[in-house]
Design a protein with these regions (language model features):
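PLP-dependent amino-acid enzyme catalytic core
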Residues: 1-193
Length: 193
């Protein structure tokens, strides 16, 4: 997803550098893609981000800033960096280029296992499940795509079941500890999952 988005940037956006927020793998995807393309990257990570992910992201050449207790707080800081440093924001899930790139995962899966009936996909902000569901349904309309969330962050479950469970707390699955599903992936998820 991150590489697909980075490849879509124009020269001005590349020259200004990129910024993203993530407590998960998106941070490393952006840092890796930026390094490949020679683009300066800044990643904002919430306080609860595991040290291993912080270290891996810095090892890939990104400037890492730890800010906020949640992804929402990290995103607010990213938005301020977009303004003050003139950086290009690479959103982890609410972006069509990110979603399209994440769908390529299904190509790899079906190449090795052509007869898959189900895909169990982790759900944070919804980008991964949106992208994989588009590609899966395109290749096999009968494949079932099932979203998996932590009990502490049931944002998609709440949408489908009119639930009112709060999204909060500490989980080992911090990469999918997202309080709100993105509006772009949600419209896709409602049709495919």
């Amino acid at each position: 997803g991150a590489l697909n988005k980075m490849l879509s940037l124009n020269n001005k956006e590349k020259d200004s550098g990129v910024v993203a927020m993530s407590a998960g793998n998106h941070s490393q995807g952006v840092a890796y893609s930026a390094k490949l393309m020679g683009i300066k990257s800044t990643i904002v990570m919430p306080d609860n981000t595991p040290f291993a992910k912080i270290r891996k992201t810095t090892d890939l050449g990104a400037e890492v800033i730890i800010h906020g207790n949640t992804l929402i707080e990290a995103e607010a800081f990213v938005d301020s960096l977009v303004e003050t440093r003139n950086l290009t924001k690479i959103h982890p899930y609410n972006d069509t280029q990110i979603i399209s790139g994440q769908g390529t995962l299904v190509l790899e899966m079906l190449e090795k296992h052509k007869d898959l009936d189900f895909l169990l996909v982790p759900v944070g902000g919804g980008g991964l499940i949106a992208g994989t569901s588009i590609m899966a349904k395109h290749l096999n309309k009968n494949i079932k795509v099932i979203g998996v969330q932590t009990e502490l962050y049931p944002s998609l479950h709440n949408i489908f079941n009119k639930g009112k469970n709060k999204c909060q707390g500490t989980t080992l699955a911090e990469g999918i500890a997202v309080q709100n599903i993105g509006s772009i992936p949600l419209s896709i998820i409602k049709n495919n999952v």
